[in-house]
Amino acid sequence: MGVVEDTEPPLKRAKRLADEPNGFSANSSVRGSSVNSNSLGDLMARPLPSQGDDETIGSKGVIRKSEFVRIITRALYSLGYDKTGAMLEEESGISLHNSTIKLFLQQVKDGKWDQSVKTLHRIGFPDEKAVKAASFLLLEQKFLEFLKVEKIADALRTLRNEMAPLRINTKRVHELASSLISPSSFISHTTSTPGKESVNSRSKVLEELQTLLPASVIIPEKRLECLVENSLHIQRDSCVFHNTLDSDLSLYSDHQCGKHQIPSQTAQILESHTDEVWFLQFSHNGKYLASSSKDQTAIIWEISADGHISLKHTLVGHHKPVIAILWSPDDRQVLTCGAEEVIRRWDVDSGDCVHMYEKGGISPISCGWYPDGQGIIAGMTDRSICMWDLDGREKECWKGQRTQKVSDIAMTDDGKWLVSVCKDSVISLFDREATVERLIEEEDMITSFSLSNDNKYILVNLLNQEIRLWNIEGDPKIVSRYKGHKRSRFIIRSCFGGYKQAFIASGSEDSQVYIWHRSTGKLIVELPGHAGAVNCVSWSPTNLHMLASASDDGTIRIWGLDRINQQNQKKKLVQGSSSNGVIHRCNGN
């Protein structure tokens, strides 16, 4: 493998209640004439010791039994187990809601809006804004129900005498006032617009009340589910080896994966290239793998349903090493970039070269696709960035002092940002719409970069044997660093991968593949096997347990789980000479 001077931009390298909520007993009643809101608020704030409010369960003593039972009761009702929920309330002596809250909720269900507003104020919530918002919600439903049965005078009185005096949500008051001009049209629009609830949907009112009133008063319907999901997600996120779908999480035991979830066993060795393999990339649909080599060829590999990989096409036509091969957004075509030579576009199905892109007197050293697949971008040897349509017509070409020798280039999925290595230690983020540029300035030479699937992060490989993860939303900032791999002379490429791209993988000059946990930066596994520097790695976007690595030893290793290796141990490793793949020569113009 050739050595590149570190002083030059490289081609391949320089490489929380009382037992009875709110202090009310289950059989108590509250009269507005004898108890004011402040005293009720005090009752809410002071639990009754006789009810055992301070009793806790669990080994750590942080779970109040009354809250725990109420949440279970709420979940039972939500699941439709009404009899079981009622039995739990009776047996435990812990009511889901006190009598006043029960009365309030029933009044809402029955559409007794005046009574429900009065009961709301009797409860004595300390947050006046929340009470006003809840009152507005109840009165709005009252207004809409009058409107639906064409009781226009009653609707107007509700709006003028009850809602407007609250002095909140003025815009909505004006909208409702306008509806009095043509009630039927308003009702029709409200009930027929996608995503809108029917105007008489009292259940919707109850749902919205949950967002306005304290959870200690009206326990959210899905509270238990929310707690359980949060617990599972925390367990998942703290597991550095987690590399399975959420459907595999279980409530029966604490979640903890092992290294067996990380692709760490050689499943196949692909040996069709005759020289160093410099680049490889899985297709977006995960059905293919493409590789390029110093041997001046590129190969398209096909992946079967069981994960076995076989040669599909060998792409011949370049007269210099092929430094990169990139998939079109629809995976129907690939681009290959010859080292300071030409860019060629190939059809995946046939293996034919359908077009060649070049510019007189200068050559490409990097290339990429437009996100819609209808154009090509390239960094050129004369420090310019050129863009062509598929037919080779030049669309844009930036020249001059603004650009440097561009050794890596990409465009975000929305087509807004053009990302390129524009100087030895600088990455340019150019906003094509606003024509403004942001820069990521590193402390050492940048050898390559990779964008995350969501285009919010960029992984940067540096000459000093460090990989840095930058958040590029807003002002760019470093969020993590990865160390351990070896790099001194060559371009080494890294990638995101695994479940929700939770891992970082990289090649290394010591012939190993390195994998880190993305969030913590912890090195979790080193994969030996290659006999030469590992130049590039790619993680399948559809198979969480498939990783590919390209090496100077002329081979591509496919890494999988232990069980995958066992399933394939009797199968012969893929040999280029025994493949049925076809060699294609480029006749593109």
UniProtKB/Swiss-Prot annotation:
<feature type="repeat" description="WD 2">
    <location>
        <begin position="317"/>
        <end position="358"/>
    </location>
</feature>
<feature type="repeat" description="WD 4">
    <location>
        <begin position="401"/>
        <end position="440"/>
    </location>
</feature>
<feature type="repeat" description="WD 5">
    <location>
        <begin position="442"/>
        <end position="480"/>
    </location>
</feature>
<dbReference type="InterPro" id="IPR051350">
    <property type="entry name" value="WD_repeat-ST_regulator"/>
</dbReference>
<dbReference type="Pfam" id="PF23627">
    <property type="entry name" value="LisH_WDR26"/>
</dbReference>
<keyword id="KW-0963">Cytoplasm</keyword>
<protein>
    <recommendedName>
        <fullName>WD repeat-containing protein 26 homolog</fullName>
    </recommendedName>
</protein>
<dbReference type="Pfam" id="PF00400">
    <property type="entry name" value="WD40"/>
</dbReference>
<feature type="repeat" description="WD 1">
    <location>
        <begin position="272"/>
        <end position="311"/>
    </location>
</feature>
<dbReference type="GO" id="GO:0006970">
    <property type="term" value="P:response to osmotic stress"/>
</dbReference>
<feature type="compositionally biased region" description="Low complexity">
    <location>
        <begin position="25"/>
        <end position="39"/>
    </location>
</feature>
<dbReference type="GO" id="GO:0009737">
    <property type="term" value="P:response to abscisic acid"/>
</dbReference>
<feature type="repeat" description="WD 6">
    <location>
        <begin position="484"/>
        <end position="526"/>
    </location>
</feature>
<feature type="repeat" description="WD 3">
    <location>
        <begin position="360"/>
        <end position="398"/>
    </location>
</feature>
<dbReference type="InterPro" id="IPR020472">
    <property type="entry name" value="G-protein_beta_WD-40_rep"/>
</dbReference>
<comment type="subunit">
    <text>Interacts with RANBPM.</text>
</comment>
<feature type="repeat" description="WD 7">
    <location>
        <begin position="529"/>
        <end position="569"/>
    </location>
</feature>
<keyword id="KW-0853">WD repeat</keyword>
<dbReference type="InterPro" id="IPR006594">
    <property type="entry name" value="LisH"/>
</dbReference>
<feature type="region of interest" description="Disordered">
    <location>
        <begin position="1"/>
        <end position="57"/>
    </location>
</feature>
<feature type="domain" description="CTLH">
    <location>
        <begin position="97"/>
        <end position="154"/>
    </location>
</feature>
<dbReference type="InterPro" id="IPR019775">
    <property type="entry name" value="WD40_repeat_CS"/>
</dbReference>
<dbReference type="GO" id="GO:0005634">
    <property type="term" value="C:nucleus"/>
</dbReference>
<dbReference type="InterPro" id="IPR036322">
    <property type="entry name" value="WD40_repeat_dom_sf"/>
</dbReference>
<dbReference type="InterPro" id="IPR006595">
    <property type="entry name" value="CTLH_C"/>
</dbReference>
<comment type="function">
    <text>Acts as a component involved in the crosstalk regulation between light, hormone and abiotic stress response.</text>
</comment>
<feature type="domain" description="LisH">
    <location>
        <begin position="64"/>
        <end position="96"/>
    </location>
</feature>
<dbReference type="GO" id="GO:0009723">
    <property type="term" value="P:response to ethylene"/>
</dbReference>
<dbReference type="InterPro" id="IPR001680">
    <property type="entry name" value="WD40_rpt"/>
</dbReference>
<dbReference type="GO" id="GO:0005737">
    <property type="term" value="C:cytoplasm"/>
</dbReference>
<keyword id="KW-0677">Repeat</keyword>
<dbReference type="GO" id="GO:0009733">
    <property type="term" value="P:response to auxin"/>
</dbReference>
<dbReference type="GO" id="GO:0009646">
    <property type="term" value="P:response to absence of light"/>
</dbReference>
<dbReference type="GO" id="GO:0010150">
    <property type="term" value="P:leaf senescence"/>
</dbReference>
<dbReference type="InterPro" id="IPR015943">
    <property type="entry name" value="WD40/YVTN_repeat-like_dom_sf"/>
</dbReference>
<dbReference type="GO" id="GO:0009416">
    <property type="term" value="P:response to light stimulus"/>
</dbReference>
